Amino acid sequence: MTASERELIKETVADFVEREIRPAAAEADETQTFPEDVWDGLAELDLTGLTVSEEYGGFDADQVTYSVINEELARGDLSVATALSVHCLATACIERFGTDEHKSEWLPEMVNGRPVGAFALSEPDAGSNPREMTTEARREGDEYVINGKKQWITNGKRAGVIVLFAKTDRDDPDSITQFLVPKGTDGLEVGKKEDKLGLRASDTTSLRFDGARIPEENRLTEVGSGLKAAFSILTGGRIAIASQAVGVAEAALRDAIEYADEREQFGKPIADHQAISHKLADMATDVRAARLLTRDAAEKNEDGVDPMAASMAKYFASETAVDVANEAVQVHGGYGYTKDFDVERYYRDAKITTIYEGTSEIQKEIISRHL
């Protein structure tokens, strides 16, 4: 894709963000309700098929374009961007590891926005170390019987299909395998929606499997290949989260600049006071550095998986989002501590980018191992 084509896509998404996403974000956050009409709009723009090839009607975005789109969406509402990126994780798994039958059955409809996809890897006692998962998919004849619990599942209630990671032998950490579990499967129970600090419009739930049965053909990967598959997918996922973190930081920066230009104290705009102007300069520099690091990781991932570049981007961009959102609240003073201004939401939303799809601490572990 050429730079001019990518810029046109960015402008199209940015226009949708301004018209549809940003106006709905505050209410969606307040009511903890996902804006389904926005999701339908994403589907109309073909964004629900970002990681799907053209063969199945998808957008087939390259890594840099995927990064640009994630940044723009998160600038409008991180909840929407997160829901889409997890849906795209699910479609990427089906595209990369599924059979032709899997792809034909699921991808064309998922490209059109329904069913929504979920990605079930984390568990209550197995977050940063998935090898400790206890969910088991035991083979019985031509079926797998699933027992266990998953935690922190984005799109948990909305999902029509779940990409599930489970051990075929609970005592064997090398037996982790990837499966497809459709909504409505007997023995699958979706837990209550988590009441979170931020990302409140995105539904995050637990999933409980109690003797849930799926046919053998719903196995996506070879037995024991699920974790390797997950890590290969999550490298791109971390770049998406880094991009979203840049989007949140950019939104906070823009709002801070606008407020500083309008708010007057001591007879002039606060932007003309060095204490504020230098703060804005630091924020702008950090946002640009995070964006460049993230785009570099995306370019490297286009040529082949580069875990260190992805982890550097995810670590730096997410910490930048937290810092810039914090400073944006500070620029707004007391007003920034109220829901009347979006920086309050950015401040709450930014924190999750340092946690999901690998904490900042895990990113530093990955970086240090590759030095």
Please tell me what each predicted stretch does.
Residues 110, 125-128, 152-155, 167-170, ...:
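Short Gly/Pro-enriched turn/cap motifs at secondary-structure boundaries
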Residues 147-190:
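A short core secondary-structure module
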Residues 135-138:
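A structural signal for short hydrophobic beta-strand segments in well-ordered beta-sheet cores
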Residues 132, 184-213:
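Flexible, small-/acidic-enriched active-site or ligand-binding loops
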Residues 1-76, 80, 97-102, 109, ...:
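Alpha-helical interface subdomain recognition
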Residues 113-121:
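A short, Trp-centered hydrophobic/proline-enriched beta-strand micro-motif
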Residues 208-229:
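A short, charged helix-loop
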Residues 89-97:
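Helix-loop "lid/cap" segments that line or gate small-molecule binding pockets
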